Amino acid sequence: MAPRKNKTVKEEVQVSLGPQVREGEIVFGVAHIYASFNDTFVHVTDLSGKETISRVTGGMKVKADRDEASPYAAMLAAQDVAEKCKSLGITALHIKLRATGGNRTKTPGPGAQSALRALARSSMKIGRIEDVTPIPSDSTRRKGGRRGRRL
Protein backbone atom coordinates (compact mmCIF):
# COMPACT_ATOMS: atom_id res chain seq x y z
CA MET A 1 0.00 0.00 0.00
CA ALA A 2 1.12 3.53 -0.74
CA PRO A 3 1.62 5.95 2.18
CA ARG A 4 -1.12 8.48 2.87
CA LYS A 5 -0.65 12.02 1.65
CA ASN A 6 -2.21 13.96 4.52
CA LYS A 7 -0.39 12.20 7.33
CA THR A 8 1.07 14.58 9.94
CA VAL A 9 3.84 13.66 12.33
CA LYS A 10 2.89 14.12 16.00
CA GLU A 11 5.56 15.35 18.39
CA GLU A 12 5.99 13.26 21.52
CA VAL A 13 5.43 15.21 24.70
CA GLN A 14 7.79 14.43 27.57
CA VAL A 15 5.76 13.44 30.64
CA SER A 16 7.53 13.50 33.99
CA LEU A 17 6.18 11.77 37.06
CA GLY A 18 6.15 13.56 40.38
CA PRO A 19 5.99 17.26 41.19
CA GLN A 20 7.75 19.96 39.16
CA VAL A 21 10.30 21.50 41.53
CA ARG A 22 13.03 24.07 41.51
CA GLU A 23 16.53 23.32 42.78
CA GLY A 24 16.77 23.30 46.57
CA GLU A 25 13.00 23.26 47.11
CA ILE A 26 11.65 20.82 49.70
CA VAL A 27 8.86 18.53 48.47
CA PHE A 28 7.15 16.32 51.04
CA GLY A 29 5.75 12.83 50.72
CA VAL A 30 4.30 10.53 53.38
CA ALA A 31 6.09 7.28 54.27
CA HIS A 32 3.70 4.73 55.75
CA ILE A 33 5.83 2.12 57.57
CA TYR A 34 3.83 -0.94 58.62
CA ALA A 35 6.00 -3.22 60.73
CA SER A 36 4.44 -6.49 61.86
CA PHE A 37 6.32 -9.52 63.13
CA ASN A 38 5.93 -11.23 59.74
CA ASP A 39 6.86 -8.46 57.27
CA THR A 40 7.68 -4.76 56.93
CA PHE A 41 6.00 -2.50 54.36
CA VAL A 42 7.48 0.85 53.34
CA HIS A 43 4.86 2.69 51.31
CA VAL A 44 5.40 6.28 50.13
CA THR A 45 2.44 8.36 48.95
CA ASP A 46 1.84 12.02 48.18
CA LEU A 47 0.58 14.27 50.99
CA SER A 48 -3.06 13.34 50.43
CA GLY A 49 -2.24 9.63 50.72
CA LYS A 50 -4.16 8.77 47.55
CA GLU A 51 -1.33 8.59 45.02
CA THR A 52 1.23 5.83 45.59
CA ILE A 53 4.78 6.79 44.68
CA SER A 54 6.57 3.62 45.75
CA ARG A 55 5.82 0.53 47.83
CA VAL A 56 8.43 -2.06 48.78
CA THR A 57 8.20 -4.83 51.36
CA GLY A 58 10.86 -6.75 53.23
CA GLY A 59 9.72 -9.92 51.47
CA MET A 60 10.54 -8.38 48.08
CA LYS A 61 14.16 -7.87 49.17
CA VAL A 62 15.11 -11.21 50.74
CA LYS A 63 14.71 -14.81 49.62
CA ALA A 64 13.99 -16.64 52.90
CA ASP A 65 10.50 -16.31 54.41
CA ARG A 66 11.91 -16.08 57.92
CA ASP A 67 13.87 -12.94 57.02
CA GLU A 68 10.92 -10.87 55.72
CA ALA A 69 10.46 -9.00 59.01
CA SER A 70 14.18 -8.65 59.77
CA PRO A 71 15.80 -5.23 60.21
CA TYR A 72 18.09 -5.95 57.25
CA ALA A 73 15.15 -6.53 54.87
CA ALA A 74 13.44 -3.37 56.16
CA MET A 75 16.63 -1.38 55.58
CA LEU A 76 16.91 -2.61 51.99
CA ALA A 77 13.24 -1.81 51.35
CA ALA A 78 13.62 1.71 52.76
CA GLN A 79 16.74 2.39 50.68
CA ASP A 80 14.90 1.25 47.55
CA VAL A 81 11.97 3.54 48.32
CA ALA A 82 14.24 6.51 49.06
CA GLU A 83 16.03 6.08 45.73
CA LYS A 84 12.71 6.04 43.84
CA CYS A 85 11.51 9.14 45.74
CA LYS A 86 14.66 11.07 44.89
CA SER A 87 14.32 10.21 41.22
CA LEU A 88 10.76 11.59 41.27
CA GLY A 89 11.77 14.79 43.06
CA ILE A 90 10.58 14.10 46.62
CA THR A 91 13.17 15.35 49.07
CA ALA A 92 11.44 15.10 52.47
CA LEU A 93 9.10 12.65 54.19
CA HIS A 94 6.56 12.68 56.98
CA ILE A 95 6.58 9.26 58.68
CA LYS A 96 3.48 7.33 59.75
CA LEU A 97 4.53 4.27 61.74
CA ARG A 98 2.05 1.44 62.30
CA ALA A 99 2.09 -1.84 64.20
CA THR A 100 -0.48 -4.61 63.79
CA GLY A 101 -2.79 -3.13 66.43
CA GLY A 102 -6.47 -3.88 66.90
CA ASN A 103 -6.81 -6.76 69.34
CA ARG A 104 -3.29 -7.93 68.44
CA THR A 105 0.09 -6.48 69.47
CA LYS A 106 0.52 -2.72 69.65
CA THR A 107 4.33 -2.81 69.50
CA PRO A 108 5.92 -2.37 66.05
CA GLY A 109 7.94 -5.23 64.58
CA PRO A 110 11.73 -5.46 64.37
CA GLY A 111 11.93 -3.69 61.00
CA ALA A 112 10.33 -0.40 62.06
CA GLN A 113 13.36 1.29 63.57
CA SER A 114 15.80 0.22 60.87
CA ALA A 115 13.43 1.32 58.08
CA LEU A 116 13.11 4.76 59.66
CA ARG A 117 16.85 4.97 60.15
CA ALA A 118 17.58 3.96 56.56
CA LEU A 119 15.24 6.69 55.27
CA ALA A 120 16.99 9.28 57.43
CA ARG A 121 20.47 8.15 56.36
CA SER A 122 19.64 8.23 52.65
CA SER A 123 19.62 12.06 52.75
CA MET A 124 15.83 12.34 52.97
CA LYS A 125 14.69 15.08 55.31
CA ILE A 126 12.32 13.80 58.00
CA GLY A 127 9.32 15.96 58.88
CA ARG A 128 6.87 14.64 61.46
CA ILE A 129 6.87 11.13 62.90
CA GLU A 130 3.46 9.84 63.93
CA ASP A 131 2.25 6.52 65.37
CA VAL A 132 -0.95 5.46 63.60
CA THR A 133 -1.36 2.00 65.15
CA PRO A 134 -5.08 1.23 65.43
CA ILE A 135 -6.08 1.20 69.10
CA PRO A 136 -9.52 -0.31 69.85
CA SER A 137 -11.94 1.58 72.07
CA ASP A 138 -13.57 -1.75 72.86
CA SER A 139 -12.52 -4.71 70.82
CA THR A 140 -13.65 -8.15 69.83
CA ARG A 141 -12.40 -10.98 71.99
CA ARG A 142 -8.73 -11.77 71.66
CA LYS A 143 -7.67 -15.24 70.52
CA GLY A 144 -6.30 -17.73 73.02
CA GLY A 145 -9.41 -18.72 74.94
CA ARG A 146 -10.40 -18.22 78.54
CA ARG A 147 -7.18 -19.50 80.10
CA GLY A 148 -4.84 -17.89 77.56
CA ARG A 149 -2.11 -19.45 75.47
CA ARG A 150 -0.41 -22.28 77.34
CA LEU A 151 3.20 -23.01 76.44
Curated annotation (Swiss-Prot):
Q: Does the keyword Ribosomal protein apply?
A: yes
Which residue stretches belong to region Disordered?
Answer: 130-151
Which UniProt keyword terms apply here?
A: Ribonucleoprotein, Ribosomal protein
Q: Which family does it belong to?
A: Belongs to the universal ribosomal protein uS11 family.
For this UniProt entry, the molecular function terms from Gene Ontology, in alphabetical order, are:
structural constituent of ribosome
Task: Specify the species.
Answer: Aedes aegypti
- Pfam families, A to Z: Ribosomal_S11
The name this protein goes by in its record: Small ribosomal subunit protein uS11
Superkingdom of source: Eukaryota
* HAMAP family reported in the protein's UniProt record: Ribosomal_uS11
- The annotated regions of Basic residues compositional bias extend over 142-151
